Amino acid sequence: MSDIRLDSATFFKRAAKIFDSWEKPSGDTQALEDINSIAIILGDPNDEVASYTKTTALQLWLLGYEFPSTLMVFEKSPRKVTFVCGSSKAKLIRQLQPSDGIEIDVKVRSKDATAAKETMEEVVASLNGKFGSLPKDRPIGKLVDEWNSAVESKSDLEVVDVAIPISAVLAEKDGEELKTIITSAKLTSTVMINYFKSKMESIIDRGTKMSHEALAQLVEEKIGNEEKGPDMKLWNKNPSLGEIDFASSEFVYSPVIQSGGKYDLKVTAASNNDNLKPGIILANMGIRYKNYCSNMGRTFLISPSKKQETQYTTLLEVRKEALALLKTGAVASDVYNSVHQSLETKNATLADSFLKNLGFATGMEYRDSSFLLNAKNNRELKENMVLVLTIGVADLPDAKNKGKTYSLLLSDTVKIGQNGAVVLTEGCTRLSDVVMDMEEEEEEDVKPQIDKKPKINNSPKKPRSSTVGGRVLNAKTRGANREQATQTTAEKIKTNQQRLHAQLNADGVKRWEADAGGKNGAQQKVVKRYESYRREEQLPRAVEDRRIYVDEQRQSVVLPINGYAVPYHISTIKNVTKTEESNHMVLRINFQSPGQIAGKKEDMPFEDPDANFIRSVSFRSQDQRHMLKVYEAITALKKAAVKRETERKELADVIEQEKLIEVKGRHPYVLKNVFPRPGPEGKKTDGNVEIHQNGIRFRPDGPASKIDILFSNIKHLFFQPSEKELIVIIHVHLKAPIMLGKKKTSDVQFYREVADMSFDETGGKKRRARYGDEDEIEQEQEDRKRRAELDKLFHDFARRIETAAQAQQFELEVDVPFRELGFNGVPHKSIVALLPTTNCLIHISELPFTVITLSEVEIVHLERVQFGLKNFDMVFVLQDLKKPPVHINSIPVAHLDNVKEWLDSCDVPISEGPVNLSWPAIMKTVNEDPHAFYAEGGWNFLTGSGSDDGSEESEEGSEFEGDSDVFDESSGSDEDSESAFEGDSDSASAESLSDEGEDWDELERKAKRADEKHRTDRGGDSDDDGKKKKKGSRR
């Protein structure tokens, strides 16, 4: 304690405030008028006594620290403060020297009982008549017993409760106090909006089972504890929280999370062990920073009824009125009555369930019980008071769940001002911010009566995660409602897309505003300087022969020009050509120079492009052998230089990871017998994956190199179950690529084959004779069981990785693909199944992998969308305009509506056109001046009717259209064969099969023709075959 320094200036300033209110009592301090002294005593620490009391708050307010077992006695005239405490505390308090007319007396309480009693009797003897105290705080301890005994022994003393006057003194905050409370409020709102909301949505969306208490603990850990520090990734989302002292931060109480029909709106409520459930979810949390408290409470509505949305909107209106009424001079009871009367006018049912108070004053004491915003409190509000405003209704009957009730709550920390209250914990109050729609509820709401008149929703777009399950609902609309529902969905998509495109343009202009007029807003190309030889003496002796000399060590070519040896670095040479003439050979060396039509993606920068350049130089010689040798040497040197530069650029983004820290004191969690892809040595190697302190490690069984992946470098973590696959996968997508062997990779996955490949070699006759054999049925059951066990094993391990990463303050969540939203396409060279996840579009079943992060996508353009074509293409333009767009070709047109609906639900801007565009030319134009591009309309040109300008390919189709017919007709994948008979399928519904189906003879003839065509084309798998079929299919 010797390093503790008390702030004397703050103590005397605030003590003077107490004496000033005491000497000139009025209003709330009127009770001090006849009092000669005030005794404030803090007893021994006790868990049973509330931690937030006026005694503790007063000590912290004056001294900055809590001093247990300490008595403070204020005497009015002359102004004097007497402290009675132990010797160690007395040394600290003696730092306060008398100042500003306030005398300080420090009495040391002896450990001897008799001496301690005499000291206390001496202090009590100085008291006369009435003295103020805080009896409701109920302190305990030896010091308290000695004090009570001494007071009782003096019969002429009368105790007066001064809770209200002390509350009034503490209520009005100065500038430093307000600054601290605002920081506390920012901490609370940041953890509520940026962590709890998204975490809760993720749990509900995925159907994860997690108790209220467990979720509250996750929230509480974000502030840090003794084992680990604060989650800076979360707090850095609010720039104003970058440099605060988290050691001075703590939760006022463990966050209170309630759902499932059990709600308690009292201050004493706590989270229970029930699992978080959809419906109405209440969340309350408060953070204390440098002893000042703040609080925030929100209601989240999961698939609410129209009535619940209306009720919540009503509460928002009442909240707005309450904020206007909470101003300097207003009486607390009048505010409550006005708000209650307003609610009664709007909705009498809600008024009957309205809470008995609107909140309370807060500060160093979390809840000032002497200042409640209720109908009985006639105290006036003062400027710069800070309140917790709570608008809530309790125990409303739930129409959807008979016998159950629900509650609605909005709670904020507010500051009183001249013209109303200012909300310090603003955010996440609008209906669109708190509503999350689930699939089941939307299915129930699809009724003929409603569908006849499309629902108009003027609220902004729902959060992205709220629509994961709702993207395919239109395919489930039955009968006469199908067309109407599809039309309604199209209208919603159109409205949302107009908003997204407007926002995209506005953000683009703002993003590139600082670079207006500049070129591409990126770093200018650096001119590289090469120095072959610093001094003439370094030239090789061979140049004395005045012949062309290739110096491989210096990466230079020395040319004899006018009798001088002139060296040229290989980077300045573009290429070399040779021409044979009868008995001569001409060697022509072409140099790099500006203005050439090189057809390269990057032009070589020059210091002065306007200078005079030598384009080429020619040498003619009869020594053909020497000239050929020089030609080959220059060519080889150029190839080596180009290769080195290519490798350098390719490895420029590869990072050197930090060292993996292995867990100590226990064995790491292990997933055994898995295969990595790509392999560490380019070969298939099995081994184990281990979870360590700051990352995961693949430890091979053989001599191959181990693979370390740090949590800090993991961008996405995917788990793909074995459904319709032969393997189960844990896939890691990295932020920056790493080296595996001699190749770089941004994706590493660990998989295990579901079962060894087995073949039934039984003849056809025997198979028909034993159809339904019990052995085969048992084998299928075992296979399903084995798949389920393997899926659970990998999923649990992925969850362990997520937990370990979150323990190291990394925001990492396991993402599982939605197979029902999947579609086929060609991201590379073959048709594969592409599966959406919560945040990405992926293909990870086989190499090469495809992982597209939707948050990094600027716009998605759909190409070749026109009547008569079976396929369309999709182009992802990334926010990093320097990166080339990602193409996915040959997507069956049957998936067009679902793809649009999925992208729209993820708030991704979409455009479409009838032809393929020349994207290299488009991106070159965009990068030349991004600000001008966005200022002139940005990507709006894509949303027009489209034209043939910039078209690279004709309307017949993209590279893989020739293969797609064969794929559609003869592919034997599980996905295609099953989807043809699904009742929900867009391409072949039950109605279409019954109304327009062909007979078996016709189907058999078509299958025979397809087989013959398949054999003729040799399967149609290679690129060459595909091109041949494409060419032959044109008419």
Swiss-Prot record:
Entries under InterPro entries matching the protein: Creatin/AminoP/Spt16_N, Creatinase/aminopeptidase-like, FACT-SPT16_Nlobe, Fact-SPT16_PH, FACT_SPT16_C, FACT_SPT16_M, Pept_M24, PH-like_dom_sf
GO-annotated molecular function: histone binding; histone chaperone activity; nucleosome binding
Keyword DNA repair: yes
Region (Disordered): 440-471, 944-1035
Gene3D superfamilies: 2.30.29.150, Creatinase/methionine aminopeptidase superfamily, Creatinase/prolidase N-terminal domain, FACT complex subunit Spt16p/Cdc68p, Pleckstrin-homology domain (PH domain)/Phosphotyrosine-binding domain (PTB)
UniProt biased composition (Acidic residues): 949-985, 993-1002
Coiled coil spans: 637-657
Main location: nucleus
Membrane-spanning parts: none
Cellular-component GO terms for this entry: FACT complex
Pfam families associated with the record: FACT-Spt16_Nlob, Peptidase_M24, PH_SPT16, Rttp106-like_middle, SPT16, SPT16_C
Record keywords, A-Z: Chromosome, Coiled coil, DNA damage, DNA repair, DNA replication, Nucleus, Transcription, Transcription regulation
GO biological process, one term: nucleosome assembly
Compartments where found: Nucleus; Chromosome
Residue ranges, compositional bias (Basic and acidic residues): 1003-1027
Self-association and partners: Forms a stable heterodimer with POB3. The SPT16-POB3 dimer weakly associates with multiple molecules of NHP6 to form the FACT complex.
Annotated PANTHER family: CDC68 RELATED, FACT COMPLEX SUBUNIT SPT16
Stated role: Component of the FACT complex, a general chromatin factor that acts to reorganize nucleosomes. The FACT complex is involved in multiple processes that require DNA as a template such as mRNA elongation, DNA replication and DNA repair. During transcription elongation the FACT complex acts as a histone chaperone that both destabilizes and restores nucleosomal structure.
Family note: Belongs to the peptidase M24 family. SPT16 subfamily.
Protein name: FACT complex subunit SPT16
